[in-house]
Amino acid sequence: MARLHSGKRGSSGSTRPLRTEVPEWVSMSAEDIEAKIVEMAKDGKQSAIIGNILRDMYGVPNVKLITGKSVSSIMKEAGFYAEVPEDLFNLMKKAINLRNHLENNPRDTHSTVGLKLIESKIRRLVKYYRGTKVLPAKWRYSPETARLLVE
């Protein structure tokens, strides 16, 4: 798939092996995995980071294959999932950091263009999440609300 804001071609990536049964070398049970996810969610970690930690430190190749639920759905059941989706939250964090940089360096035109691209991607995501009822219909992005949400 191509890059979003450039004319470059994308790079091909490997696909996850198609597996329907749990590998025999996985030592953790579904209950242990769910408990570990809830424990890490209490510490404030996001679902993508939790998945990476489970893969790298605990040898869990696929949470959904073992538990039957995704990491984010386990976090939602436990009440630790944020009201703003993670991808949108991370983009808002990136935009805030770039705004702080531009306050100190107002002549950095490359970063100004980058901020416009990030904020346009945020607006597209907000439009999608409003359509899928993840965000309320009147939710709007503004740098002030993003700053309040992130901090």
UniProtKB/Swiss-Prot annotation:
Its keywords, alphabetically, are: Ribonucleoprotein, Ribosomal protein
Q: Name one GO biological process term.
A: translation
Tell me the segments the record calls region Disordered: 1-20
Molecular-function GO term, any one: small ribosomal subunit rRNA binding
Q: Does the keyword ATP-binding apply?
A: no
A cellular-component GO term for this protein? cytosolic small ribosomal subunit
Q: Which domain of life is it from?
A: Archaea
State if Ribonucleoprotein is listed as a keyword.
yes
Gene3D superfamilies for the chain: 4.10.860.130, S15/NS1, RNA-binding
Describe the subunit structure: Part of the 30S ribosomal subunit.
Q: What's this protein's family per the entry?
A: Belongs to the universal ribosomal protein uS15 family.
Q: Which PANTHER family match?
A: RIBOSOMAL PROTEIN S15P/S13E, SMALL RIBOSOMAL SUBUNIT PROTEIN US15
Q: What is this protein called?
A: Small ribosomal subunit protein uS15
Species the sequence originates in: Methanococcus maripaludis (strain DSM 14266 / JCM 13030 / NBRC 101832 / S2 / LL)
Originating gene: rps15
